[in-house]
């Protein structure tokens, strides 16, 4: 058990008590080993999945004639009471019972007697925990997909208001070409859309039933595994019992998808941090997402995006931990796999919290009085435009203009470099150089060059699929609106 577990066991929970498996052993487990090997204080969050799996298993056992109808009814009644106790906080989690499974089974047996002891027929904790984690993760993936949709909608809403706002596009963090601010935001919508696709794809492989694999070799009881899978809404059953109980590739795959999603959040965070700095001043974020300084009264720090950037390393670290956890394990189940839960749980918690916060930080919060969102990012269009002009963002447009006049691109590139040098020496934008000066660099330049050199002209000219022209951006906005509304 991790030393960072939120709840520490009380002294009476450590009282020596027979374990569910202890009949073979000549001495009780030491308190230190109990603490070290117990997982109940973090895996208890699996209780709903554990009860759902047990109820489906019991229903199948009764249908197959392995337990009686009365035992089945008693198990259902006992599980209903346990559900109420856990939900209300009245359930007593005990360290001696090691994990969520044995805690629930022990309470069930206390409530309904022998029927509770019969529930574990045909299964092991090995296939039970693999089932629980899959059921739990399936539900969390569904929540994450919804949160990804909310974040995409927030970005789309801000983009819709800023189609004509011109942002300097950067390469190497140097001004490159002008782009629509909406176009820039939609790049992140594309990333988060792929993240959602990955989550859906992972879900298919998560949503498979290990239960019935038993400890490792299957079971001698006539279980109907497909019936249990159908009851639990799973798409099929694990076809190899050794694989079903031992592999955690589904957890690794989810954490990889979560890591990619957090990397996208981190890239967005970096840009928000840069944009809101005094040196850029492109945006402001609402005060509730910033903090002050204990010594410098003028500071308004972007702690939320900074923390998201930092938490990305945390999630990527969990991915590396899970991969390392699995790499040396022989078949089948090993106790190492107990260490899959804390990184998996923390990855889910971190990702969900981050997506929720970013959706509100970017798009704002619904105001019931107005029916509109308040408090999203505030855009400084003038600062963006000034930065684009200062960086000679239309230099490529001048080169393209000369190519259309018949120059080879490399010659046009060199000609424009000389023009930029002249503009820099006079502290003006290319569009502010007189026509006569521009013609000195090449006689093919005519008055229409100023259409190409304007920021708006540069935007409008990039009217190919996926380009930054406002017409293209509006088409993409409509596509995303339709997709997210479906």
UniProtKB/Swiss-Prot annotation:
Q: What is its EC number?
A: 4.3.2.1
Query: Which keywords belong to this entry?
Result: Amino-acid biosynthesis, Arginine biosynthesis, Cytoplasm, Lyase
Q: Name one GO cellular component term.
A: cytosol
The record lists the catalysed reaction(s) as:
2-(N(omega)-L-arginino)succinate = fumarate + L-arginine
The pathway it acts in is: Amino-acid biosynthesis; L-arginine biosynthesis; L-arginine from L-ornithine and carbamoyl phosphate: step 3/3
Name the predominant localization.
cytoplasm
* Location relative to the cell: Cytoplasm
* Cross-referenced Gene3D superfamilies: Fumarase/aspartase (C-terminal domain) (1.10.40.30), Fumarase/aspartase (Central domain) (1.20.200.10), Fumarase/aspartase (N-terminal domain) (1.10.275.10)
Among the GO molecular function terms of this UniProt record, one is:
argininosuccinate lyase activity
Biological process (GO) annotations? arginine biosynthetic process via ornithine; L-arginine biosynthetic process
Family, as annotated = Belongs to the lyase 1 family. Argininosuccinate lyase subfamily.
Name under which the protein is recorded? Argininosuccinate lyase
Species whose genome carries this gene:
Acidovorax ebreus (strain TPSY) (Diaphorobacter sp. (strain TPSY))
